């Protein structure tokens, strides 16, 4: 019996494997796969349609065409299983063996495998140490190669032309062997003794001096090492036997009309077989050499085309002029095996239809058309019909269903109750694009969708379609209900804020009912409770917007957790009091006693989730929605053209602007301003004007004059329909209303530059023909941009997912002490993101102490910061917190829960097995479509208008200096003499409120820790000149000042004062080229003074174009300006914005002119310049010097004698992330990447949590570069996975040997994806050929650790609920007990770790 059951399993290969290994196939292995040799190119007999014997479809080789039936029909049925027919040679078995039985072709002459020859770097070339060009000349019969020199002066692997060969034959007769073609290469490869070659190279690498040779040797050592370790032989890269793919994988299908559709592979195989057979015949006939050679070359070319068509020479085309699809093309690209069939499969039990709005559904429901449900749940319905006895057979049940009998519908109702379905809207950019709902049967053919989940799906009802899938197994249903149900996805995983927020109509309704208006019916009435008020409202005694007093009863929770009722009389409006009726118990009335704009509603739902948990919030969100719709209907808001009020001031503002433009035009004509300045100023004037008119318009629309209850005339917010919509956040924005009622403003040309004549009209007035034409320009560009943007954004998401796909939470605590220090983010003096927002949901890395009290920790190490904790931190005035980060996590694979912190979508500590990598990739990729594509062009004045020349405080408090070096001027002010100094303002609690950068040479009007008032000016400076400040008091002495050569004297006509300007280098002529004009400060006797704290003389090198106003010998005091350098309006640097910028950062691309950072700390001096470069020298503390050559056109921002620290900017520009990592380390790099990426997203108003960017940065830092190999087997300069080096070093240290030293390397996301340990994942991403070639040579083993690899081999992913399956599978093979397994999977927490976290409604995931 057991064998009978085994019958079905014989064909199934085992699924229980732990790894997949790839390698080179030896000829013996290929022959062992084969079931016979394919000798003829024929496919099938066109009369009988039966396969030809020994042909490409031969039944004797590949198996029978029909199950259990031989080709000639002698043996049929199961009883002859396994018999080989003596007449036709077919084995009687299942026909599906034709999918797995391979054949082979014995090649008459060896052939090189094109992947190992042409895929760069050429493996055959490296192995033989010959160039690819030379090998190709041998292979394609253009030259001889010496395979065995014997005793002749010839070298092995030396190439000989035909003449040289004949000459050598004459000279040396048969003393040497030389041949051509793949045989020659095969011989050379066969002779290589890998071990001795390896030893020779290891010796050579020690003595070699040349850089290029070293690189070549390193590559060869790696390759030979790979061959030795994997057990591959070099000659296997040359094929002597060619495997033939099973016929069912390259089918030949008869079409009607007697023609055949065939796979391209059959054509390619036919070509190879034809040429091979012809070559055999020629060799038998011992034909002339030239003919044989030609045939061999053609055979090589046809095998090349079969393996990878088009890689060498022109691609072989079929009858229809398109290139044939070779074996390589089958697996690579979007249509290849990996991406088309293994990573994206089509599934059954699915349907799709248009979606319509379902405003009366509950949040967990969706409306499913009856017809669709019946089709989807058919098998369930059949089973139930049979169980009920309404049908006896499946056939009978089928008939009932087809006739759509009445009882079928009742049964369908029962079947679908409590059976969730999964809805999906393409494009699925993040995990909220697929959610589970309980179906409700509806009439019609459209799917009803709950309005609150539209944001998550990014769906609207203008014809969008959605797909429905049915989870069949019990496990799938359970997961759909527990994890994917729409009620479990209230918070966005990107930022932890509610994603189930009302929008549009609902917001409008709630806003309308919560507005307060003056002098409405019933104003000033007092009500005992809300039900009394409701009665009054229903009887039209009070109006909805009247201001009234109501007694509200609330439930309050005190410190002990006891719940008490508290009632109070509140000033409110009728609408808000009615709104309080749906407020769940435990939420304060304050939350709704305000205008319910979209922001406030979001805050309300967030508070509800944090205070009351999931279930209450879901019910509340539904009630909010129903209320919103009801009152939107009552409001009856509509817009008409009269709602667009054009401000009266428009005419006069336009007049002023036109006047200004005329003035500038005149200045330009008289030559006072350049064309560029004129353009910039004009654009500036118009954008300012536009803003003024827009403000006037918003004031006009947004306020109205009314008489209040006391008879006075007052202004109140108007109820203008347009204004209501924009103000509530329901639809539209001030920008759009501006175009309707103020002026359209400036338009953009397709290249992104601004047209200087604005559109003065608005849409209500109507545009003139010319204005309309101008506006079409930019509009078309916008549409083209959108299309490109979607593609680019999708590609970015794909790369991000690929680099992070194997990152999961693998343990609770890795025990690291490292982390990142978080501080508030400040821009232009304002705090953009306070500290509490940055550390919320993070785990503290070390105790946080009270500022000014080092004994008392507020928060202890390893605490998860929730809302209560961050409030405490803010109260205490903490300015920086060190938190755990994925970047510093020390888990070998994946990250640990404490380094990751809170799961943003659930609000508690992240669960074991959560796929945090994919979530990070989706959170960053999904808003990609909202980012802009264009680079911003910023002209001169657009910037110079905003040239800041002082610091004015916005809040009162005390001043704190950070990193600030300053000297005290004689008049009592301080002068800044450092570049990276900052001034901050702290409030009474010591919390930082503002922070400003101070430029060099700024005058500071306050002392450190001084009290300041709001509006006070702390510091000021000249924005147009960069001063050089003297740090000592003494007398000026000019050095190398030669009039007319290095300096030009200028006298001002008005004042008569003279000043000297340092001449440009080009103008100095030959005698001035070695002069270095500088100002030295000396004492009375003329001795050099030194800068305090150093032994450098106080001298200041003057760069070209700097201006000196002092005379030689004049006295200077501390803090006086010695010279100043005019700053031209900063060069227009295009700011790359939007998507391209994000992509550049993640790809870790070096900017075009990167900032030059100081390689070490020390004091600056300048050396002798070369032709196009200036020489900058940094002298460090122990006197060693480091030189840096800097192009003349770059502006150096440091001066002689200035002290710089390692990694400080010395030449302005965009810093390169690689430099930051090398000079400053991982933490500053992380801070830089997070800041730069967040800046782009913040500009678009997109919120993404920092930890997602950190997760991706972690993956970019996976590799390290070996700087000193120690006793390890790594080579210097090799890039290796960090974890491999750590493991290897641990072994070395255990044996008391020298460990390898290494530096972290930053790889871009594409590079990092391709450099992953898993070759299956890398091959399915990009450059499939290269990845597989490399992996085969190394004999790589893929341990199937990531998500992609497991999807490809058809298993559950090792994340989420699939992690338990994997751990059980692993340990069942080891045979552990239950308790041991629990310990391993990570139930236990590491010692000394406490995790404090409120886990409300937590759904524990496997683990």
Swiss-Prot record:
Residues 1384-1407 are annotated as: Disordered. Residues 1386-1399 have a biased composition (Polar residues). Signal peptide: none annotated. GO terms for molecular function: DNA binding; DNA-directed RNA polymerase activity; magnesium ion binding; zinc ion binding. It catalyses: RNA(n) + a ribonucleoside 5'-triphosphate = RNA(n+1) + diphosphate. One of its GO terms (cellular component) is DNA-directed RNA polymerase complex. Zn(2+) 2 binds at residues 814, 889, 896, 899. DNA-dependent RNA polymerase catalyzes the transcription of DNA into RNA using the four ribonucleoside triphosphates as substrates. The RNAP catalytic core consists of 2 alpha, 1 beta, 1 beta' and 1 omega subunit. When a sigma factor is associated with the core the holoenzyme is formed, which can initiate transcription. This is DNA-directed RNA polymerase subunit beta'. It comes from Xylella fastidiosa (strain Temecula1 / ATCC 700964). The lineage of its organism: Bacteria, Pseudomonadati, Pseudomonadota, Gammaproteobacteria, Lysobacterales.
């Amino acid at each position: 019996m057991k064998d009978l059951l085994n019958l079905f399993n014989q064909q199934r290969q085992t699924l229980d494997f732990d790894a997949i290994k790839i390698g080179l196939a030896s000829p013996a292995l290929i022959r062992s796969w084969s079931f016979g040799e394919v000798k003829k190119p024929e496919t099938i007999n066109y009369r009988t349609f039966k396969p030809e014997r020994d042909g490409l479809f031969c039944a004797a080789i590949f198996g029978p065409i029909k199950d259990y039936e031989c080709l000639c029909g002698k043996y049929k049925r199961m009883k002859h299983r396994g018999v080989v027919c003596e007449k036709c040679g077919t084995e009687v078995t299942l026909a599906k063996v034709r999918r797995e039985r391979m054949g082979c072709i014995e090649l008459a002459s060896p052939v090189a495998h094109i992947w190992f020859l042409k895929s760069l770097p050429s493996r055959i070339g490296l192995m033989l140490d010959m160039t690819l060009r030379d090998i190709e000349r041998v292979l394609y019969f253009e030259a001889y190669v010496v395979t065995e020199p014997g005793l002749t002066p010839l070298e092995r692997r030396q190439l000989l032309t035909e003449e040289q060969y004949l000459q050598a034959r004459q000279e040396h007769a048969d003393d040497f062997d030389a041949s051509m073609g793949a045989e020659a290469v095969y011989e050379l490869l066969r002779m290589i003794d890998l071990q001795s070659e390896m030893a020779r190279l290891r010796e050579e690498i020690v003595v070699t001096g040349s850089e290029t040779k070293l690189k070549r040797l390193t590559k060869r050592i790696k390759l030979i090492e790979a061959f030795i370790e994997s057990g591959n032989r070099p000659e296997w890269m040359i094929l002597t036997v060619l495997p033939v793919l099973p016929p069912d994988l390259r089918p030949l299908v008869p079409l009607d009309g007697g023609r055949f559709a065939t796979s391209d592979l059959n054509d390619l195989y036919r070509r190879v077989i034809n040429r091979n057979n012809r070559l055999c015949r020629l060799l038998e006939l011992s034909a002339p050499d030239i003919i044989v050679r030609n045939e061999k070359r053609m055979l090589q070319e046809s095998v090349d085309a079969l393996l990878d068509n088009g890689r060498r020479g022109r691609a072989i085309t079929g009858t229809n002029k398109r290139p044939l699809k070779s074996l390589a093309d089958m697996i690579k690209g979007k249509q290849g095996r990996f991406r088309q069939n293994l990573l994206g499969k089509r599934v059954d039990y699915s349907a799709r239809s248009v979606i319509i709005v379902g405003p009366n559904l509950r949040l967990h429901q969706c409306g499913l058309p009856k017809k669709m449900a019946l089709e989807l749940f058919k098998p369930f319905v059949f089973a139930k019909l049979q169980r009920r006895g309404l049908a006896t057979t499946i056939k009978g049940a089928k008939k009932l269903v087809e006739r759509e009998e009445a009882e079928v519908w009742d049964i369908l109702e029962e079947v679908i109750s409590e059976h969730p379905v999964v809805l999906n809207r393409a494009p699925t950019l993040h995990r909220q694009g697929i959610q589970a709902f309980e179906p409700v049967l509806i009439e019609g053919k459209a799917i009803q969708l709950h309005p609150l989940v539209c944001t998550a799906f990014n769906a609207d009802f203008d014809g969008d379609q959605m797909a429905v899938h049915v989870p069949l197994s019990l496990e799938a249903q359970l997961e759909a209900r527990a994890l994917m149900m729409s009620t479990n996805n209230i918070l966005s995983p990107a930022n932890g804020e509610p994603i189930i927020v009302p929008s549009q109509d609902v917001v409008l309704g709630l806003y309308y009912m919560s507005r307060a208006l003056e002098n409405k019916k019933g104003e000033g009435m007092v009500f005992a409770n809300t039900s009394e008020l409701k009665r009054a409202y229903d009887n039209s005694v009070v109006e909805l917007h009247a201001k009234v007093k109501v007694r509200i009863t609330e439930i309050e929770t005190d410190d002990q957790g006891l719940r008490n009722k508290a009632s109070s009389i509140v000033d409110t409006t009728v609408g808000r009091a009615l709104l309080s009726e749906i407020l769940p118990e435990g939420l304060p009335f304050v939350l709704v006693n305000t205008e319910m704009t979209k922001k406030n509603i979001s805050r309300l739902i967030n508070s509800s989730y944090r205070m009351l948990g999931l279930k209450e919030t879901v019910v509340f969100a539904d009630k909010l929605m129903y209320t919103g719709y009801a009152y939107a209907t009552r409001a009856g808001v509509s817009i008409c053209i009269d709602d667009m009020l054009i401000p009266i001031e428009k005419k006069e503002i336009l007049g002023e602007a036109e006047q200004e433009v005329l003035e500038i035009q005149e200045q330009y004509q008289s030559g006072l301003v350049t064309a560029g300045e004129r353009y910039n100023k004009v654009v500036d004037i118009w954008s300012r004007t536009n803003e003024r008119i827009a403000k006037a318009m918003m004031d006009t629309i947004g306020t109205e004059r009314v008489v209040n209850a006391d008879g006075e005339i007052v202004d109140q917010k108007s109820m203008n329909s347009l204004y209501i919509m924009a103000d509530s956040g329901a639809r539209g924005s001030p920008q759009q209303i501006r175009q309707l009622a103020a002026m359209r403003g400036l338009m953009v040309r397709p290249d992104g530059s601004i047209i200087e004549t604005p559109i003065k009209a608005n849409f209500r007035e109507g545009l003139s023909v010319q204005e309309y034409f101008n506006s079409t320009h930019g509009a078309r560009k916008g549409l083209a941009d959108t299309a490109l943007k979607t593609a680019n954004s999708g590609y970015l998401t794909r790369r991000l997912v690929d680099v992070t796909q194997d990152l999961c939470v693998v343990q609770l605590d890795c025990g690291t002490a490292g982390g990142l220090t978080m501080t508030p983010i400040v821009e232009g003096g304002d705090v953009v993101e306070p500290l509490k927002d940055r550390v919320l949901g993070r785990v503290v890395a070390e105790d946080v102490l009270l500022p000014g009290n080092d004994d008392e920790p507020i928060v202890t190490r390893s605490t998860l910061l929730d809302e209560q904790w961050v409030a405490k931190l803010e109260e205490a005035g903490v300015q920086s917190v060190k938190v755990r980060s994925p970047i510093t996590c020390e888990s070998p694979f994946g990250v640990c829960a404490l380094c990751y912190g809170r799961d943003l979508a659930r609000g508690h500590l992240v669960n074991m097995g959560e796929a945090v990598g994919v979530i990070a990739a989706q959170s960053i990729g999904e808003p990609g479509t909202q980012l802009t594509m264009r680079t911003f062009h910023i002209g001169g004045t657009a910037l110079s208008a905003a040239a800041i020349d002082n610091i004015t405080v916005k809040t009162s408090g005390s001043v704190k200096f950070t990193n600030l070096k300053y000297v005290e001027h004689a008049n009592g002010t301080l002068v800044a003499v450092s570049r990276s100094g900052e001034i901050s303002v702290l409030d009474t609690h010591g919390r930082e409120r503002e922070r400003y950068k101070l430029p060099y040479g700024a005058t500071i009007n306050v002392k450190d820790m001084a009290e300041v008032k709001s509006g006070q000016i702390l510091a000021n400076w000249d924005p147009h000149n960069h001063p050089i400040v003297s740090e000592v008091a003494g007398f000026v002495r000019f050095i190398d000042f030669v009039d007319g050569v290095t300096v030009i004297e200028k006298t001002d006509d008005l004042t008569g004062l003279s000043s000297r300007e340092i001449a440009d280098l080009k103008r100095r002529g030959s005698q001035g080229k070695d002069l270095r004009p500088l100002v030295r400060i000396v004492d009375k006797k003329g001795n050099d003074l030194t800068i305090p704290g150093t032994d450098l003389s106080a001298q200041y090198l003057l760069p070209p174009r700097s201006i000196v106003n002092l005379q030689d010998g004049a006295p200077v005091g501390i803090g006086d300006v010695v010279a100043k350098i005019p700053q031209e309006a900063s060069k227009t640097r295009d700011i790359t914005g939007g998507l391209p910028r994000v992509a550049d950062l993640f790809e870790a691309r070096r900017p075009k002119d990167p900032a030059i950072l100081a390689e070490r700390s020390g004091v600056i001096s300048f050396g002798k310049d070369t032709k196009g470069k200036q020489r900058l020298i940094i002298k460090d503390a122990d006197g060693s010097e480091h030189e840096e050559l800097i192009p003349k056109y770059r502006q150096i921002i440091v001066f002689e004698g200035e002290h710089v620290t390692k990694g400080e900017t010395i030449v302005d520009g965009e810093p390169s992330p690689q430099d930051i990592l090398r000079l400053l380390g991982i933490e500053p790099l992380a801070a830089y990447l997070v800041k730069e990426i967040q800046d782009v997203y913040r500009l678009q108003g997109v919120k993404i949590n920092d930890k997602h960017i950190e997760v991706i940065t972690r993956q970019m830092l996976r590799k390290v570069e070996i700087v000193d190999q120690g006793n390890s087997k790594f080579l210097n300069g090799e890039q290796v996975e960090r974890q491999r080096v750590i493991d290897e070093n641990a072994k070395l240290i255990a044996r008391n040997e020298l460990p390898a030293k290494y530096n972290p390397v930053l790889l871009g996301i594409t590079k990092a994806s391709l450099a992953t340990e898993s070759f299956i994942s890398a091959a399915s991403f990009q450059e499939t050929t290269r990845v597989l070639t490399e992996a085969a040579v190394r004999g790589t083993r893929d341990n199937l650790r990531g998500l992609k690899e497991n999807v490809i081999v058809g298993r559950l992913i090792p994340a989420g609920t699939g992690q338990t399956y994997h751990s059980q599978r692993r340990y069942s093979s080891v045979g552990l007990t239950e308790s041991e397994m629990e310990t391993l999977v990570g139930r236990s927490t590491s010692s000394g770790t406490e995790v404090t976290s409120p886990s409300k409604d937590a759904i524990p995931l496997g683990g």
